[in-house]
Swiss-Prot record:
It is an enzyme of class 2 (transferase). K(+) binds at E43. Pfam families: S-AdoMet_synt_C, S-AdoMet_synt_M, S-AdoMet_synt_N. Mg(2+) binds at D17. This is S-adenosylmethionine synthase. It is found in: Cytoplasm.
Length: 385
């Protein structure tokens, strides 16, 4: 019996907000490559024919921001003015200041690097669940996989009529035990050229994108498919919508299945706890679930600006814990260092690894260090299970 429905969405690399995220993280990576201690907060705004880059950057690195932006736009595939953004001819404006000296002092006021303060106040969440192989919620996982499949088929020429812009959305039905029953609805909107009839597009999308991605066990006669349900989608990207860094925070995280502190990720160096603490919380939650200590785990971290350690750590397992809650609290406090310096060291974050995070989600992708499950044995042994 269905207890509730849950829906998550994803967007493609060519979506305007994701163009902005990729530019911001490409600039961050280029700076970190030269200066791992750089302080970067880089925001990007996109509209037809124009890119505006702003923020606060303090670094010894020398980078060509305009060139980085153009190269990123080129790699995404925007190479003609008719697309709304041309890597070669678009206007790129840059308004960059240095980080506030007061904030810089609050972070670095102590000569002991282990006492590096948080760059801001705020709360961050990390989440894991055993309902998928990557210990992520199924709705966001499969929404991302649809978009990844679409991107692959566009790039390899299998579906040459595909455009750069796309959005996916999946609704799952869950039972009273929070277990998946089936998929009730799939929404997929793909930009396309004018040469393909709508019905041919829908058939090809179903056969080449949807069916190879979604597990048959979760599909039924009741599953509804909405492929380009609004009709033709030939005008997209920066022509139809502006783009802005950090506007897809739910797509970037857990698709709404877990709570969110509100801070975005892209364009921020790891001294910003908005980003690094969210990664650390995911790392801890994933290891708790991978160790079999809980079926679902959400960890909240809270910080005060200039203070080295979190002012609050909370763990929620939704009644799925296999050991005492007090044991879980002890384990995460003993085996995970959530101070800003500790997080950067624990996950090796002061390096150029961020551009790849800007599309298809920051979590559930094994190439990132916060996805390691290297503390499983330690946790299990300490919990005596």
């Amino acid at each position: 019996m269905t207890r509730f429905l849950f829906t998550s969405e994803s967007v493609s690399a060519g979506h305007p907000d994701k163009i902005a995220d990729q530019i911001s993280d490409s600039i961050l990576d280029s700076i970190l490559e030269q200066d791992p201690k750089a302080r970067v907060a880089c925001e990007t705004y996109i509209k037809t024919g124009i890119v505006l880059i702003g923020g606060e950057i303090t670094t010894t690195a020398s980078v060509n921001i305009e060139k980085i932006a153009r190269n990123t736009i080129q790699e995404i595939g925007y190479t003609h003015p008719k697309m709304g953004l041309d890597a070669n001819s678009c206007v790129i404006l840059s308004v960059i200041n240095q980080q506030s000296p007061e904030i810089q002092y609050s972070i670095n006021h102590d000569s002991d690097r282990t006492q590096q303060g948080a760059g801001d106040q705020g709360s961050m969440f990390g989440y894991a669940t055993n309902e998928t192989d990557v210990l992520m919620p199924a709705p966001i996982t499969y929404a991302h996989r649809l978009i990844q499949r679409k991107s692959k088929l566009r790039k390899n020429g299998t579906l040459p009529w595909l455009g750069l812009d796309a959005k996916s959305q999946i609704t799952f039905a869950y039972d009273e035990n929070n277990k998946i029953i089936h998929i009730t609805a799939v929404v997929l909107s793909v930009q396309h050229n004018k040469n393909i009839p709508l019905e041919a597009l829908r058939e090809a999308t179903m056969e080449e994108i949807i069916k190879p991605v979604l597990p048959q066990k979760w599909l039924s006669k009741q599953t509804k498919f909405f492929i380009n349900s609004g009709g033709t989608f030939t005008i997209g990207s920066p022509i139809s919508d502006c783009g802005l860094t950090g506007r897809k925070i739910i797509v970037d995280t857990y698709g709404g299945m877990a709570r969110h502190g509100g801070g975005s990720f892209s364009g921020k160096d790891p001294s910003k706890v908005d980003r690094s603490a969210a990664y650390a919380a995911r790392y801890a939650a994933k290891n708790i679930v991978a160790a079999g200590l809980a079926e679902r785990c959400e960890i909240q971290l809270a910080y005060a600006i200039g203070i080295a350690n979190p002012i609050a750590v909370n763990i929620e397992t939704f009644g799925t814990e296999k050991v005492l809650h007090s044991t879980l609290v002890t384990l995460i406090n003993n085996f995970f260092d959530f101070s800003p310096h500790g997080v950067i060291k624990m996950l090796n974050l002061a390096r150029p690894i961020y551009k790849d995070t800007a599309v298809y989600g920051h979590f559930g992708r094994e190439q990132f260090p916060w996805e390691k499950i290297d503390k499983v044995d330690l946790l299990r042994n300490s919990a005596k299970i």
